[in-house]
Amino acid sequence: RRGFAQRRKQLRKNLPDDVDWGKVCEKLKFSPTARAEELSLDDWVALTREVDPFFEKEEGQGDDEMLAVVDEDDKVVGSERRDIIHRDGLKHRAVHIFVLNQKGEIFLQKRSRLKDKCPGLWDSSAAGHVDAGEEYENCAARELLEELGLTNDDVREVGKLGAHANTGWEHVRLYATLAKGKIRVPCVEIEYGEWFTMPQIDDWVEAVPEDFAPGFLACWKVWKEANQGRFEDGE
């Protein structure tokens, strides 16, 4: 019933505030009072191309992307293509970011089923490989923008994880930040996302760990250790 009601609303009332509806209508030849139910499939594709900055966005790092190769101590020893690093199990770098809201909830993403690693599993708010020549913190800011549309520049390091099988042989830096602005996700990267309280996540991880990417589970353990007081207080 709610879905039917949304179809009857004027489209401009269902779009983000930053969309210039007048310009969109002028470019796509839409009526300013157009309703969702009045658009054809081609109209919807054209509208998505126009207002969604992530539409047809390619995955942030392809197989030919050059990543830093590191040793056991996380010292850079060279660079290599992403596909070769994964094929040969070379140690490399990655970041995970937990995005929190004012309520203290954490945004988790469900990885797209188009992803080559852990498709359809729940994961950190944002995560990604560190490019060759890139610093961890810069990578965290880039991933926030690419995966969530956030321009946060105040990420805080929470902890470090050494390279091992559970992290995919990645040296990981875990960051946290407070959400600033509305989260917008690219469907090629993320199937779905939702806010959860820390106890909700912890209970879920304990009950059904197979729902989560291994890298997230390793990061969650570090997060719990860094925020033990919150769990003990039942927050």
Regions found by a protein language model. Give the residues of each.
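Short hydrophobic/aromatic beta-strand or adjacent loop that forms the aromatic wall/cage
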Residues: W44, A94, E170-L174
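Acidic, metal-coordinating catalytic segment for phosphate/diphosphate chemistry
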Residues: E59-H96, Q102
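Class I S-adenosyl-L-methionine
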Residues: R1-T48
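A residue-level signal for conserved active-site and pocket-lining positions in enzyme catalytic cores
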Residues: L11, S40, I97, Y175, ...
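Nudix hydrolase/Nudix homology domain
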Residues: D83, E157-G162, N166-E235
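Internal catalytic-core helix/loop-beta-alpha segment
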Residues: D131-A165
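Conserved Nudix-box catalytic region and its N-terminal flanking loop in Nudix hydrolases
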Residues: D83-H96, N101-R142, I190
